[in-house]
Amino acid sequence: MKTIVVCSGGLDSVSLAHMVAAQGGLTRLISFDYGQRHRKELDYAALAARRLGVPHHVIDMRGVGAVLTGSALTGGAEVPDGHYAEETMRITVVPNRNAIMLTVAFGMAAAMGDQAVATAVHGGDHFIYPDCRPAFTQAFQQMQDAALDGYAQARLLTPFVHRTKADIVTEGARHDTPFAETWSCYKGGALHCGRCGTCVERREAFHLAGIPDPTAYEDADFWRQAIAERERA
């Protein structure tokens, strides 16, 4: 199935790109510049596209991102430290982000004759991000069926929506994903900070999967404290 992968450059989406490529269906990667403070992730998406030998389309959505205020990812608020499941991480929500990006990706699929759009939303995202939940992805498919009725048919592929990030690490390793060439940290510094929710989740996922983590962190041990505090709460 000819498939576009929505690729941020993060561990999840790059692993998904490698999986789809191994299945023989990858046609292109699509990424979005929405003014995110961790824009360096797009460089890792470009690396993945070159490695996999497919076109990489970067959609400039900085004007859209500028009006999606209130998120630490696009505004001046600090990205909080701690586990993803913490209530404080809600400040990293960018309203309607996945709905907007997937709509553009489906339009591209219809225009270019691709049959599917794959996105790496996973079970660990459900607590914080409503547009990563099964209810959203199912409703989005129904909306696109209506939007493209009589013009094109495209499927939304969400192979990780009921799986954990540790499962994604396992799947990525199976398909030789170079994890060191992915970017997760929301703070966008020279190294992964090791303290924000996505760094903690990344470090924990490698631990649970039993696979060595090649990532260099500014604080490589904070994740244990964050998990312990979550468990005590």
Curated annotation (Swiss-Prot):
GO molecular function, one term: zinc ion binding
Residues where ATP binds: C7, S8, G9, G10, L11, D12, S13, V14, S15, L16, A17
Binding of Zn(2+), residues: C185, C193, C196, C199
Cofactor: Zn(2+)
Keyword Zinc: yes
Stated name of the protein: 7-cyano-7-deazaguanine synthase
Stated family: Belongs to the QueC family.
E.C. numbers: 6.3.4.20
Organism: Paracoccus denitrificans (strain Pd 1222)
One Pfam family this sequence matches: QueC
Note accompanying the cofactor annotation: Binds 1 zinc ion per subunit.
Gene3D superfamilies referenced in this protein's UniProt entry, alphabetically: HUPs
General function of this protein: Catalyzes the ATP-dependent conversion of 7-carboxy-7-deazaguanine (CDG) to 7-cyano-7-deazaguanine (preQ(0)).
Gene Ontology biological-process annotations: queuosine biosynthetic process
Pathway annotation from the record: Purine metabolism; 7-cyano-7-deazaguanine biosynthesis
The entry's keywords: ATP-binding, Ligase, Metal-binding, Nucleotide-binding, Queuosine biosynthesis, Zinc
Reactions performed catalytically: 7-carboxy-7-deazaguanine + NH4(+) + ATP = 7-cyano-7-deazaguanine + ADP + phosphate + H2O + H(+)
Top-rank taxon: Bacteria
